[in-house]
């Protein structure tokens, strides 16, 4: 997983609330056994059926900072929802409320799910709608979002922040303990099974 300190990209105003994981990626796309290739399924029902959906607007098509309404990522636990967002090109999702399981899955996969005040989300929406294609800078170090000179604070828990800044997924965390694991295995009695 890559280290995340600061990201700048096109902001995408997703002015919808209660976006659940089935809306993020419909169940029909969950049959793959790999962790990549899910970008076509992202918001598929909206992208294919609603010509006015935000990602169908050329100015937002290459967005990487999704500014969503409250209660983003609710519903069933789908790592695929996070994978689809990342595969499409999103590095950050901003919302006033996230489902706990989505927020956890996001942090583990390198997607920043940053919580902001709803009033700030609405101000960002207004800016992004008035200036399609506007750049948004998200600083994990400063815990700030900047768009066209306006600076907004966001919240992310310290542990997730540390993991993202260090670029540590679950495997990376385990590998940091490689010496301790080897020492433990060396002390194990020989009659116990070992992993190869």
UniProtKB/Swiss-Prot annotation:
InterPro entries: 3-IsopropMal_deHydase_ssu (IPR004431), Aconitase/3IPM_dehydase_swvl (IPR015928), AconitaseA/IPMdHydase_ssu_swvl (IPR000573), IPMI_Swivel (IPR033940), LeuD (IPR050075). Belongs to the LeuD family. LeuD type 1 subfamily. This is 3-isopropylmalate dehydratase small subunit. SUPFAM superfamilies: LeuD/IlvD-like. Keywords: Amino-acid biosynthesis, Branched-chain amino acid biosynthesis, Leucine biosynthesis, Lyase. GO terms for cellular component: 3-isopropylmalate dehydratase complex. The gene is leuD. Its EC number is 4.2.1.33.
